[in-house]
Amino acid sequence: MSSNDQINRTRALELALANIDRQYGKGAVMRMNDAQKAYIDVIPTGSIALDYALGVGGLPRGRIVEIYGPESSGKTTLTLHAIASVQRAGGIAAFIDAEHALDPEYAKKLGVDIDALLVSQPDSGEQALEISDMLIRSTAIDLIVIDSVAALVPRAELEGDMGDMHVGLQARLMSQALRKITSGLNQTGTTAIFINQLREKVGVFFGSPETTPGGRALKFYASVRLDIRRVETIKQGTEAVGNRTRVKVVKNKVAPPFKQAEFDVLYGVGISRESGLIDFAVDRGIIKKSGSWYVYGDDQLGQGKENARRFLLENKSVADEIENKIISLLGFRSNEFGDLPDHDAAVRTSPDTNSRKVSGTGAVHTTSGSPSAGKGTASGAVNNSRDSTGGDTPAGQGPLNLSVNRDVSTDTVSSKISDATHNQKPAGNGKSVKRKG
């Protein structure tokens, strides 16, 4: 190819890129090196072993994550720890409780600020996914959890008789919803966690008969898929106090897959941070184990793992020091929680979202609200029922570090998602949310 041809091709490309930027906004097309970050923003899971198995230090932001496993294996517990991590970093999380089984007291024990957590208990699968999409495109949500895919019942099935056959309805619903949700997640930096159950295929003689409901779309759209199982019961004497849990990363688009992590889940406590630190530090020589004794530097942590765990629980500075050494050894960033997504950038590039109405009782509200707060208005409002003068910001939760131009505090949130507009008009046809305090 001659030099003149090369120059003409370069000019034609620059002209095309300029036209695209004018029509769709700056950054609609960019070179890979411009778009690539030096690191991936993540949400810690609460288990340092699982953060390491994921390869990037936690659940990637702006992606879809699927967590599946048998009953009582720790799926919801894991997501509640992720919610607590987001809230400690000053972010906003939402929980779509399609199973109507969320326990606020248990969530509080795991470190979740239930006054700030947005909760929706939708009437149908369509309503749940529509609310999820509207929250994501509001550009104000950092993490949204859908519990669970199996409970997203299509409206046609709810309105039909008990014995009616509805072939493929849920799979088609999930496929359509994921096509819409995926683009919004990438533009806003929101992470969506789908909890899923297990089913068994009939007549399978070779390979695993286990499968997950909701069709195959979620398997393709998910950047990370986690298979979580109980492997043994933790006992003190004859009393069961928790479970040893194993998580296998069966799919990972951001790091090598098929790694495994094990950690302790204690009843009423959740994932034991201290037990995880002990296991990891012993494997890497940070904590020395002599017989049944655990020793860290000049400190004797205790005889037996339970005594060592209690020592770290009572001496937080020692636990923090061990954790920082592990993070440094593994190459994780010192700021484990990462930076919150640039919500202003999401506002500038967010796609056009028409005003939509969501009917029924599944409007979003906070867990501290009265039962009547859950009765949805037709516009699908987001309501936080705490008074702006009542209730302090929980310990360990910093102020919201979101760059969206809005007059809002962490104590009062009242947004009309369906017809919201922003003071600054974004590039293209995008619309955003103005939060009113």
Swiss-Prot record:
Keywords: ATP-binding, Cytoplasm, DNA damage, DNA recombination, DNA repair, DNA-binding, Nucleotide-binding, SOS response. Can catalyze the hydrolysis of ATP in the presence of single-stranded DNA, the ATP-dependent uptake of single-stranded DNA by duplex DNA, and the ATP-dependent hybridization of homologous single-stranded DNAs. It interacts with LexA causing its activation and leading to its autocatalytic cleavage. ATP binds at G69, P70, E71, S72, S73, G74, K75, T76. One of its GO terms (biological process) is DNA recombination. It holds the Pfam family RecA. Belongs to the RecA family. It comes from Tropheryma whipplei (strain Twist). Its main location: cytoplasm. GO terms for molecular function: ATP binding; ATP hydrolysis activity; ATP-dependent DNA damage sensor activity; damaged DNA binding; single-stranded DNA binding. Residues 350-371, 380-391, 400-426 have a biased composition (Polar residues). It comes from the Bacteria. GO terms for cellular component: cytosol. Residues 343-437 are annotated as: Disordered. It is found in: Cytoplasm. Coiled coil: none annotated. This is Protein RecA.
